[in-house]
């Protein structure tokens, strides 16, 4: 494949005048797809860093044992809202299951489908929910007013103001290779004094450990952003975990958001 990342339309020996990235997004290029992940963490303290960039906060707990997932809201009136949960099944293949909320009641997602990863969920029906929705695995011990315990069982959170997860984490499906194209991060602080944070892109290949791929220093007099486009995209193999993590912050109550873009390529055409 020539000029795969230049924007020219050359795939599998076919050349044209269109934009390759646009055509991938439109689903016109067989075996190629785009993943856009985004997340935020609204409160990171000097005593709690490092933290991952997801609304639930703290470090994300991975469970490599495939398990049934559950869902509940902390609002008892959130009944009948349709939620779609996306992740990977026990074979690390892409899986999407739809479930209806039942208020604060622990509700099984699906009819026995197992998830080894959950990395996105959103309201897919016509009615928005009012509480905060949590998705958690079978390591849960108890659920009180819709909130599971221990917190390490939580695999995703959807806040009412978003109706969509904000979690800058992803796992590459089996049979695919990810190409890390771009990432951006920003920090906010409600005062005018300069603050700073260190962002860390961390990747764990299947069977390995998390390794730091890039550190980005952010500084702010109220807000700051950092954008990086890979001239030569980073190749990430199947079943690898990707997490955007805040390594350190200089002050308490730091808010951080991150986003990254991947191109997924089927291994059969890579």
Language model features by range: what are they?
Residues 3-117, 122-270:
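Beta-strand-centric surfaces of beta-sandwich/beta-rich domains
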């Amino acid at each position: 494949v020539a000029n795969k990342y230049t924007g020219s339309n050359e795939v599998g020996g076919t050349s044209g005048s269109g934009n390759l990235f646009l055509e991938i997004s439109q689903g016109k290029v067989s075996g190629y797809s785009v993943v856009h992940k985004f997340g935020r963490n609204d409160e990171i303290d000097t005593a709690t860093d490092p933290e991952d960039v997801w609304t639930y906060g703290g470090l994300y707990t991975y469970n490599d044992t495939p398990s049934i997932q559950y869902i509940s809201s902390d609002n008892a009136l959130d009944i009948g809202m349709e939620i779609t949960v996306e992740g990977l099944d026990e074979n690390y293949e892409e899986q999407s299951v739809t479930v209806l909320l039942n208020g604060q009641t622990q509700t099984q997602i699906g009819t026995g489908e197992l998830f080894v990863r959950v990395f996105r969920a959103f309201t897919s029906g016509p009615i928005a929910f009012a509480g905060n929705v949590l998705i958690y695995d079978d390591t849960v011990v108890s659920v009180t007013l819709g909130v599971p315990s221990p917190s390490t069982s939580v695999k995703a959170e959807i806040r009412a103001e978003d109706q969509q997860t904000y979690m800058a984490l992803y796992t590459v499906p089996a049979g695919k290779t990810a190409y890390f194209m771009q990432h951006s991060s920003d920090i906010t602080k409600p005062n005018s004094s300069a603050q700073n944070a260190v962002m860390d892109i961390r990747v764990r290949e299947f069977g390995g450990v998390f390794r730091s791929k890039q550190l980005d220093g952010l500084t702010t007099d109220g807000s700051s952003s950092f954008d990086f486009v890979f001239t030569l995209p980073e190749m990430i193999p199947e079943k690898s975990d990707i997490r955007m993590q805040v390594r350190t912050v200089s002050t308490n109550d730091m808010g951080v958001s991150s986003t990254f873009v991947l191109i997924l390529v089927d291994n059969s055409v890579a």
